[in-house]
Amino acid sequence: MTHVGKRVVKNREGIDRVKLYPVDEAVKLIKERANAKFDETVEIAMNLGVDPKHADQMVRGVVNLPNGTGRTLRVAVFARGAKADEALAAGADIVGAEDLVATVQGGTIAFDRCIATPDMMPLVGRLGKVLGPRGLMPNPKVGTVTMDVAGAVKASKGGAVEFRVEKAGIIQGSVGKASFETEKLLENIAAFVDAVAKAKPQGAKGTYIQRVALSSTMGPGVKIDPATVTA
């Protein structure tokens, strides 16, 4: 058995793969097993009772994690004039218009979040086939198409996490780092679950939040009892 294989097996020890753990106990198990040589990301996965193939069952939104993600995002803003200056002052890493479009079309995407003023969207729309599949296309529903570019930049830098349901009815997202204090992770998890709960679409039928699990980058998954997560 390889060294990696042994570590995986050891990390799974003591975890009941069927049991629904209270969220605080699950976080403890995750932190204890996050033993990689880097600060592992703690991730949440939620199985929802929706079929995103139907427009009235799409789940999408953004949540501002109270304690951030522990990751520094590179933010790009499509804007001109005063709004471009505003974005730079707020801490945007890249700001541009036609020049930034050309850069992206040339294959360089040096950012993790993309924001645009409404007047820039006809221009940014040309990048749909490039930004869309990467989840980077600005969208007014999650606050990334806005005149308040300063607020959007600060939110992105401060812990704003976008979420969108995938084909199988699953939503995944980062809720912090394994090095975070337990209480901070619990607060972030509660905020994420609450945001998804509030984004329940009208077309959802039956049990909306069906399963929730936590894991770290290199660690095993731990199923949690959704009833123990409170915002």
UniProtKB/Swiss-Prot annotation:
Organism: Beijerinckia indica subsp. indica (strain ATCC 9039 / DSM 1715 / NCIMB 8712)
Keyword entries, A-Z: Repressor, Ribonucleoprotein, Ribosomal protein, RNA-binding, rRNA-binding, Translation regulation, tRNA-binding
Protein family according to the UniProt entry: Belongs to the universal ribosomal protein uL1 family.
Classification lineage: Bacteria, Pseudomonadati, Pseudomonadota, Alphaproteobacteria, Hyphomicrobiales
Assembly and oligomerization: Part of the 50S ribosomal subunit.
Pfam families: Ribosomal_L1
Official protein name in the record: Large ribosomal subunit protein uL1
Role played: Binds directly to 23S rRNA. The L1 stalk is quite mobile in the ribosome, and is involved in E site tRNA release. Protein L1 is also a translational repressor protein, it controls the translation of the L11 operon by binding to its mRNA.
GO biological process, one term: translation
InterPro entries: Ribosom_uL1_bac-type, Ribosomal_uL1, Ribosomal_uL1-like, Ribosomal_uL1/biogenesis, Ribosomal_uL1_3-a/b-sand, Ribosomal_uL1_CS
Molecular-function annotations in GO: rRNA binding; structural constituent of ribosome; tRNA binding
Signal peptide positions on this chain: none
NCBIfam families hit by this protein: rplA_bact
An annotated GO cellular component: cytosolic large ribosomal subunit
